[in-house]
Amino acid sequence: MKILIFIIASFMLIGVECKEGYPTNSEGCKITCLFNDPYCKGKCINLSTQADKKWKGVEGYCNRRDIACYCKNLPENAEVWDPNNNKCVG
């Protein structure tokens, strides 16, 4: 019985971590928003254009501190804004 509890507890501790970050526009800048969670959710989850199919995050919201869309649970190959490799010109 103790072994069964140990195995169940071990599975609960093992978490699956997904990629998170700020999606970028064509210029490499964060996608800006202002109190518009549905817009950001659409950018992260329900995008209709073929070019945006890489954004299949489960969650998306407007990060009001940075005034930019933020995505959670993105696939590992999704490109997100990187402060060390900032391509934004504006």
UniProtKB/Swiss-Prot annotation:
Signal peptide, first to last residue: 1-18
One Gene Ontology molecular-function label: toxin activity
Taxonomy, superkingdom: Eukaryota
UniProt keyword Disulfide bond, yes or no: yes
Classification via PROSITE patterns: LCN_CSAB
A Pfam family matched in the record: Toxin_3
Claim: Magnesium is one of the keywords in the record: no
One GO CC term, this protein: extracellular region
Compartment list: Secreted
InterPro entries, per database record: LCN-type_CS_alpha_beta_dom, Scorpion_toxin-like_sf, Scorpion_toxinL/defensin
Free-text tissue specificity from the UniProt record: Expressed by the venom gland.
Keywords tagged on the record: Disulfide bond, Ion channel impairing toxin, Neurotoxin, Secreted, Signal, Toxin, Voltage-gated sodium channel impairing toxin
Protein name as annotated: Putative beta-neurotoxin RjAa14F
